[in-house]
Amino acid sequence: VTATTTNGTMCSRKETITINESNIATLDISFVTIVDEASNIGSQNNLSISIDILSNDLGLGDYQFAILNTDDNTRTPFAGFQYQPLFENLEGGIYKIMINDKNGCSPDTTLLVSVIQFPKFFTPNSDGENDYWVVKGANKTFYPNSSIHIFNRYGKLVAQLEVDDQGWDGTYNGKTLSSDDYWFNITLIPADITK
């Protein structure tokens, strides 16, 4: 936009202002990559969630990003919006990715994502800490036709769970099992997959 002003002496001045178009960001699950860093040597089972933006797939705008842990409604580990679409050191859970135009030109765009995390151990001793073996980030909203099977070292099924269950308490037929290695098989069928 160019504006011209003229005063009483016939002097004029031109000023050019650039207006950048801004659209509501378009965010799709295909833009999100969840990387499990647990397989790396020396890792402490940290997760990293990143948003890959290819060739301005979000639309026109100058965007910033935030992530909200829906389990406790905190923007973890960040206090607010940031310019980098990368979030690291997350635990398993359901997260809301939020994108907005940094100039406030459009409302937030949001997307819920599931970040799966399997615990390496649990301590079912009723102290309130790690008393249940729970798969974090799995629920019926994301995985409606899913199940979890837990086996002892000899292959005997000791527990069968749904993803929304409280978790496994380390018992079989009401009796506490010994401290040992147990194996699990989890079948996660996403909600958008039809049989």
Question: What are the roles of these predicted feature ranges?
Answer:
Residues 1, 95-97, 180, 184:
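Hydrophobic beta-strand segments within extracellular beta-sandwich modules
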Residues 53, 82, 91, 103-104, ...:
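Short loop/turn motifs at secondary-structure boundaries
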Residues 4-121, 126, 130, 140-141:
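Short, compositionally biased serine/threonine- and acidic-rich segments at solvent-exposed termini, linkers
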